[in-house]
């Protein structure tokens, strides 16, 4: 949605000091948000900052908060023997005679790990590692020749994560009036440390705000709002993504300890990493005039200038310590691989508005309000990047303090700009506040579109009927004190269609490279891409919204109810055009060829009652749901990834996930024997899954059996289209449904309590995360504490454990690939972990999002110290989950990211969702 702060569009709400905010209003229907233009296509959030009123006394407010964070959910490893045994089983099934990580063979490692488990209680924390002495004292590692063997069970959670990462915020403001002038000023500071225990990241923010308003005459008011925000981010810029590597191979490798004081690779890289620093400065100045020309006519003008400046600086340091293999410390990253870089991006924006309001009431019955105006916006953007290798000193990572050859230098730059303008008007009419009418219109232009398609007109309107104000409602007013029916229709144009110049074919440059065969010398050659095909007639996406609503106030508005049903249709969506023949040699250009329809509803119920001067209670509840359907798309109806425009098709519910329906595990009874090549012979009546096997994997007892939905006797995905999808079906949807929240709280004799609950009723996710499936990625060979219940079919060893109570099928390494099912390649996963109903992740949840308990001292006590108000409070965020649909999956249900994509198998290997405890105070002098 578009964020508008004091009438000015803002891209990032986090740049605003929360204590400066006076109110927040959300506009969802097109009729009310259309007046804000093309950037309001998905609603508007109106933020009003604090401003003194005429006659206000001067007061000073101070707010302070101190908090500590920890992770809500973290994965863990089982003991090391369990990890090794799982990897050995998986690789043995693949036909591998040996399993190793950098020379450590798991079958040789297993006896040491078993003895370590017998000789130690629990996991090992960070510290000096003990060498092997004998079988009665195996220590933590053993060097056999030049080959290290690591088998200690390190406590990854304790070593790497801080359970009390500190943060604090302070804010002081001065507000009041003097004569015809009102003012509000504030200064804020916020700092936060992340939960990474080793070389943690830090974030700081500084805010300064000045709001001034003065009556120059009795008819002319002028004002200015000046904001400055600095955000300072600093973190270790290590060679590896730490969250990827600490959860990649196992708790035994790579060790999180030291030998002779030397750290191992991952710890060393984190400790010795340079600090990546990002500084974001935002300057914003807004000046406005309001002229009351007559009693009914006002003229308004405002101008805003904003600069966003981003400066980044970092380096790649050399690293010394114990490497993947070897028995002595070494340069893990040598001096010749060091470098430093800097980049800067600067965005400058100005926005101007001029509008006239005319309000007139006739006979206290007919009320008119007419507004007309014009606005414009212009943005310019510049980017610069420079990098030079081989630092003289790690302590001074500056560009001019490097000695690398010039042919290794890198310099890059780019520039961009866009502009928009619009004429707008609004007419409001009501008759005695009962019959309500509003008409809006905008004529918008954007630089993103070619001549002839830059400008478009977007109308909207709404009607309302306050039936509770009618005479016939008098007898019901004590019960239903307020009632209004609403209907609105509106069109909004969306200009956010990708690049600033999507209708212009551009030639991209390729980083210079050595091409000796082309010029006969070992020098770099400049290269250029072929221009992409573009449509020369791109224009606005048109979003049409219908909204029907009912507002009720019950029992003198002690209870209020609001209900809305809406339909939002997006026409002329930017989408891939019709497929081009392969001989063209270019990708399909995007055109205004798509349509999407969304239908949804929202319900809010609020209750508030003041029982006595000392006791007041309240409760609020809201819930909403929506579903989007693709109604037009140029596609051959190929099914695939749920949120990929490349696979969208007419009739698709946006976010749908395709997959197999899981039947059960195969048992020996499903087969009659084996073929000469080792593949199983399916028993009569059992659908054959041979066609979806890949690599050396062969379905057998203990593996997943899919349902034969089309009755063909063969499990497949057909042609991967809507008309022929074999045994595939829609198994879920990755978009949230039934999002809800409720507040419960009250006040009693100075105490205040507020509990905020928030949740999602239904949401599915298919992922190839290693935290979901054991031995998912062949490069990892990892198994986690939530994955130790799996089938085993090793009759040659006398071990057969196949049970529907086991969480997972027989193990096999490397299941992250695309597989051999047409229609599922875009989603990924194969073997036992093709997309399917059994392992679809349930992301529904109900969370106590926040609980706050406060106490305000009696005024009789505080006024003696010239304090108007003094409040202390304690608060907890993300305290616990009352419902977690994903069960023992060690990932927070609000987690959406990972190192890499969901399909890469690393979902969850990122900064975790956190819970926090805090206390604070609020003082007004």
Question: How would you label these PLM feature ranges?
Answer:
Residues 61-145, 385, 591, 608-732, ...:
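Conserved small-residue
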Residues 322-324, 446, 760-871, 876:
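Extracytoplasmic gating/loop element in the C-terminal half of outer-membrane beta-barrel translocons
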Residues 114-175, 184-186, 190, 257-292, ...:
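Outer-membrane beta-barrel transmembrane strand signature
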Residues 16-19, 36-41, 200-202, 238-240, ...:
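Short, glycine-/polar-rich solvent-exposed loops and beta-turns at beta-strand/coil boundaries
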Residues 2, 6, 211-230, 263-316, ...:
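Extracellular/periplasmic, surface-exposed regions of secreted and cell-surface proteins
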Residues 2-6, 23-27, 44-48, 61-63, ...:
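Soluble periplasmic/extracytoplasmic beta-strand elements of cell-envelope proteins
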Residues 6-32:
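Short acidic/polar hinge/loop motifs at secondary-structure boundaries
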Residues 1-2, 32-294, 357, 367-368, ...:
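Membrane-proximal, glycine/serine-rich, low-complexity loop/turn segments characteristic
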């Amino acid at each position: 949605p578009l964020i508008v702060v004091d009438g000015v569009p803002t891209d990032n709400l986090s740049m605003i000091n929360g204590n400066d905010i006076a109110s927040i209003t959300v506009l969802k229907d097109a009729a009310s948000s259309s007046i804000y233009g093309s950037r309001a296509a998905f609603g508007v959030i109106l933020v009003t900052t604090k401003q003194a009123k005429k006659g206000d006394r001067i007061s000073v407010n101070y707010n302070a908060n101190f908090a500590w964070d920890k992770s809500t959910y973290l994965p863990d490893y089982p003991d090391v023997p369990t990890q090794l045994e799982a990897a050995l089983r998986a690789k043995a099934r693949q036909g591998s005679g040996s399993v190793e990580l950098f020379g450590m063979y798991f079958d040789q490692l297993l006896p040491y790990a078993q003895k370590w488990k017998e000789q130690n209680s629990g996991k090992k924390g960070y510290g000096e590692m003990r060498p092997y002495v004998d079988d009665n004292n195996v220590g933590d590692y053993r060097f056999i020749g030049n080959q290290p063997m690591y088998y200690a069970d390190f406590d990854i959670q304790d070593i790497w994560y801080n359970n009390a990462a500190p943060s604090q915020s302070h804010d002081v403001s001065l507000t009041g009036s003097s004569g015809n002038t009102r003012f509000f000023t504030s200064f804020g500071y916020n700092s936060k440390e992340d939960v990474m225990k080793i070389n943690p990241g830090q974030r700081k923010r500084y805010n300064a705000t000045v709001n001034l308003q003065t009556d120059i005459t009795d008819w002319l008011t002028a004002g200015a709002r000046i904001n400055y925000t600095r955000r300072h981010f600093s973190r270790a810029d290590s060679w590896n993504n730490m969250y990827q590597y600490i959860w990649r191979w196992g708790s035994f490798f790579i060790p999180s300890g030291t030998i002779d004081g030397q750290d191992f690779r991952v710890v060393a890289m984190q400790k010795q990493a340079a600090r990546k620093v990002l500084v974001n400065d935002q300057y914003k100045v807004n000046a406005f005039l309001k002229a009351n020309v007559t009693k009914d006519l006002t003229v308004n003008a405002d101008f805003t200038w904003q600069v966003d400046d981003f400066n980044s600086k970092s380096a790649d340091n050399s690293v010394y310590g114990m490497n993947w293999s070897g028995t002595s410390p070494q340069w893990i990253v040598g001096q010749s691989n060091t470098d430093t870089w800097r980049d800067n991006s600067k965005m400058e924006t100005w926005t101007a508005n001029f509008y006239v309001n005319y309000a007139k009431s006739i006979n206290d019955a007919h009320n008119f309000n007419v507004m007309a105006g014009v606005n414009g916006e212009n943005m310019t953007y510049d980017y610069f990047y420079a990098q030079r290798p081989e630092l003289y000193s790690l302590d001074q990572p500056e560009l001019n303090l490097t000695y690398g050859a010039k042919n290794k230098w890198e310099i890059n730059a780019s520039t961009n700009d866009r502009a928009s303008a619009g004429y707008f008007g609004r007419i409001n009419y009501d008759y005695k506040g009962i019959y309500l009418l509003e008409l809006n219109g905008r004529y918008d232009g954007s630089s993103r579109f070619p001549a002839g398609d830059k400008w478009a007109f977007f109308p909207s309107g709404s009607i309302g009927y306050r039936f509770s104000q009618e005479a016939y409602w008098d007898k019901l007013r004590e019960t239903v004190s307020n009632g209004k029916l609403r209907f609105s229709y509106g069109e909004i144009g969306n200009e956010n269609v990708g690049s600033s110049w999507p209708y212009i074919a551009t030639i991209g440059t390729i980083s210079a490279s050595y091409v000796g065969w082309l010029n006969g010398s070992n020098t770099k050659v400049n290269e250029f891409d072929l221009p992409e095909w573009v449509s020369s007639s791109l224009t606005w996406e048109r979003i049409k919204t219908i909204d029907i609503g009912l507002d009720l106030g019950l029992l003198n508005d002690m209870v209020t109810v609001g209900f809305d049903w809406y339909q939002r249709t997006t026409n002329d969506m930017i989408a891939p055009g019709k497929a081009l023949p392969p001989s063209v040699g270019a990708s399909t250009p995007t055109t205004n060829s798509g349509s999407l329809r969304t239908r949804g509803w929202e319900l809010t119920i609020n209750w508030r009652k003041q029982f006595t001067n000392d006791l007041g209670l309240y409760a609020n509840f809201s819930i909403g749901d929506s579903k989007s359907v693709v109604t037009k798309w140029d596609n051959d109806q190929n099914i695939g990834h749920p949120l990929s425009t490349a696979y969208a098709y007419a009739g698709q519910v946006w976010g749908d996930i395709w997959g197999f329906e899981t039947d059960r595990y195969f048992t020996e009874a499903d087969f009659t024997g084996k073929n000469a090549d080792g593949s199983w012979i399916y028993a009569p009546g059992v659908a054959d899954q041979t066609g979806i096997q890949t690599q050396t994997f062969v379905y057998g007892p203990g593996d997943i059996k899919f349902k034969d939905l089309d009755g063909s006797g063969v499990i497949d995905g057909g042609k991967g289209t809507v008309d022929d999808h074999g045994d595939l079906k829609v198994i879920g949807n990755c978009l949230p449904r039934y999002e809800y929240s409720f507040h419960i709280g009250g006040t009693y004799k100075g105490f205040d309590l507020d509990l905020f609950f928030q949740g999602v009723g239904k949401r599915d996710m298919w992922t190839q995360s290693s935290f979901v499936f054991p031995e998912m990625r062949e490069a990892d060979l990892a198994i986690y504490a939530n994955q130790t219940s799996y089938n085993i079919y090793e009759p040659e060893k006398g071990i057969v454990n196949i049970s529907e109570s086991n969480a997972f099928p027989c193990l096999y390494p490397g299941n992250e690939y695309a597989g051999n099912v047409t229609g599922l390649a875009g989603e990924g996963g194969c073997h036992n972990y093709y997309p399917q109903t059994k392992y679809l992740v349930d992301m529904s949840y109900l969370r106590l999002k926040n609980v706050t308990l406060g106490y305000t001292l009696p005024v009789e006590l505080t006024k003696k110290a010239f304090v108007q108000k003094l409040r202390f409070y304690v608060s907890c965020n993300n305290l616990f989950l009352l419902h977690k649909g994903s069960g023992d999956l060690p990932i927070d249900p609000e987690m959406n990211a990972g190192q890499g994509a969901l399909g890469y198998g690393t979902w969850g290997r990122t900064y975790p969702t956190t819970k926090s405890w805090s206390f604070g105070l609020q003082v007004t002098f």
